[in-house]
Regions:
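Conserved "HGTGT" condensation-loop signature of ketosynthase/thiolase-family condensing enzymes
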Residues: 1-87, 152-315
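A generic, well-ordered mixed alpha/beta core segment in the N-terminal half of proteins
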Residues: 77-79, 85-144
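Phosphate/pyrophosphate-binding betaalpha-module
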Residues: 142-151, 155
Length: 315
């Protein structure tokens, strides 16, 4: 567990597709017209989305980026010739909280004064890589999720603001004992439960100390399992929301997935709700690839968590 004394969220910028903009988020910074964003390929569209976020945030001392493309290809291209130190994280959908932990360590140790976490995913890119190309027309199962299209950049520094990152726990890799890549919520549910228990133990806190537990992309299926596991342990959170489960309106599948679900819902739905003063962000990740699934391996999962506290009268 890592404790932070002076790590604050100062600004954020997002670029989303119309599907996310028409969902349960409010006032994203920029909405693209279609999946191609006036580019020839969707890969280049995602690169452009990342670039738009970076262009609308202060120049950082370091960038930590994560996405779902092979070898972090989209952020690698975005960072070309910027002359900014760059750290790529490839931890599936668990990366947002992990990026905040990494930046928090650097800022608190005075290695840097500030940095940006840039998270992105693109529905057409991820579906092609992990499932089937959209053109194939494969039907969506009710337990399945679909990747959100979004890039979101978050600028952190040691300059005080209303939102403080106070601590974080890096998760352990657990075996889900499931082989179904369409049931990522089921794959990740126990991981979310285990990391939450570890975090409560490490911080010597109770589940009732938190106004909200926000998980990343368990979806409706995984969120139900997660709460059942907590209840079996005698734990009843004040409030639990899964970002993937609520991101879209009238969604017939289990919801949205991808590393952007958590920050998108947090910054554009949750953060201005005055009921929530102390929030746990659990970034959930299914650590599979096509080879693993084709070879019928059970899918590992990991969850990373950070605590965000709202500082009243911080001025």
């Amino acid at each position: 567990m890592f404790k932070f004394k002076n790590v604050y969220i100062n600004s954020v910028y997002s670029v989303v597709s119309p599907k996310e903009a028409n969902g349960n988020i409010k006032n994203p910074n920029e909405v693209i017209d279609d999946y191609y964003f006036k580019e020839k390929t969707t890969f280049k569209a995602e690169v452009k989305m990342i670039n738009r976020c970076l262009a609308n945030l202060p120049t950082p001392e370091i960038v930590i980026a994560s996405n779902l493309s092979n070898q972090l290809g989209t952020s690698n291209i975005s960072m070309k010739n910027r002359n900014i130190p760059y750290l790529g994280l490839y931890t599936a959908c668990s990366s947002f909280s992990l990026s905040l932990i990494n930046l928090g360590i650097m800022i608190d140790n005075k290695n840097v004064n500030n940095g940006i976490s840039i998270i992105s995913s693109h529905n057409l890119n991820a579906e092609k890589q992990f499932r089937f190309p959209i053109e194939y027309g494969a039907p969506k199962l009710k337990r399945s999720t679909q990747t959100a299209t979004c890039a979101i950049g978050v600028y952190l520094s040691n300059k005080p603001s209303k939102y403080k990152v106070t601590n974080g726990t890096i998760g352990t890799v657990v075996d889900s004992y499931l082989k179904d890549a369409y049931n990522m919520g089921g794959v990740m549910a126990y991981s979310a439960y285990k990391t939450l228990i570890d975090h409560l133990t490490n911080t010597k806190t109770s589940i009732k100390d938190y106004d909200l537990i926000l998980t990343g992309d368990l979806g409706k299926t995984g969120a139900k399992i997660f709460i059942e596991l907590l209840n079996q342990k005698g734990l009843y959170p004040k409030k639990h929301i899964d970002a993937g489960a609520i991101l879209y309106k009238d969604e017939e599948t289990s919801g949205a997935s991808g590393p952007t679900c958590l920050p998108l819902v947090f910054f554009y739905n949750i953060i201005n709700n005055k009921k929530y003063k102390k929030i746990l962000l659990l970034s959930t990740g299914s650590l599979h690839n096509p080879e693993m699934v084709n070879q019928k391996e059970t899918i590992p999962a990991i969850t990373n968590v950070v605590t965000i506290e709202v500082i009243e009268n911080w001025h």
